[in-house]
């Protein structure tokens, strides 16, 4: 599916499909973290079952100012995280919204186009 963002001065998800996500037209086939402040970094996890607290604790440091919200894309289906994995983010009063990865792509684009401080952690399972 192709997506179009209203705000062009930030990274945005421009398309996605099974096993890939395109950010600003560039296709990615591995999990990634995308911040509305412009950062795009690989995320070192390939399976939901392998996620650790360390995967989430690094998300707050991507932006100069802490994000308001982390949108977590859990893969092809919605799966909720154990609260212990989110301890670091919750301790910093950063909200976490969990959804499947395609919904997370759409939600990230909407929030980023509104100028919100948002980070998307998008799991692409291999």
Regions found by a protein language model. Name each.
Residues 97-100, 120:
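General beta-strand structural signal in soluble alpha/beta enzymes
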Residues 107-113:
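Conserved phosphate-binding catalytic cores of ATP/NTP-utilizing and phosphoryl-transfer enzymes
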Residues 59-98:
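Mid-chain, well-packed structural core segment of small domains
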Residues 42-43, 78-81, 107:
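Short active-site-adjacent helix-start/loop capping segments
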Residues 18, 83-86, 108:
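Short glycine-/small-residue-rich flexible loop motifs, especially phosphate/cofactor-binding loops
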Residues 101-106:
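Short acidic loop-to-helix transition motifs that present clustered carboxylates
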Residues 53-61, 107:
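Short, charged beta->alpha transition segments
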Residues 1-54, 113-126:
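Non-catalytic interface/targeting segments
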């Amino acid at each position: 599916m192709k997506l179009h963002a209203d705000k062009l001065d930030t990274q945005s998800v421009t398309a996605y499909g099974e096993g890939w996500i395109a950010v600003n037209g560039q296709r990615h086939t591995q999990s990634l973290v995308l911040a509305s402040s412009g950062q795009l970094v690989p995320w070192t996890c390939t399976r939901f079952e392998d996620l650790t607290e360390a995967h989430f604790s690094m998300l707050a440091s991507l932006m100069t100012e802490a994000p308001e919200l982390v949108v977590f894309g859990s893969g092809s289906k919605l799966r909720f995280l154990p609260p212990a994995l989110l301890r670091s983010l919750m301790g910093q009063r950063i909200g976490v919204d969990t959804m499947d990865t395609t919904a997370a792509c759409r939600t990230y684009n909407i929030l980023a186009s509104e100028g919100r401080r948002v980070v998307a952690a998008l799991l692409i399972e291999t």
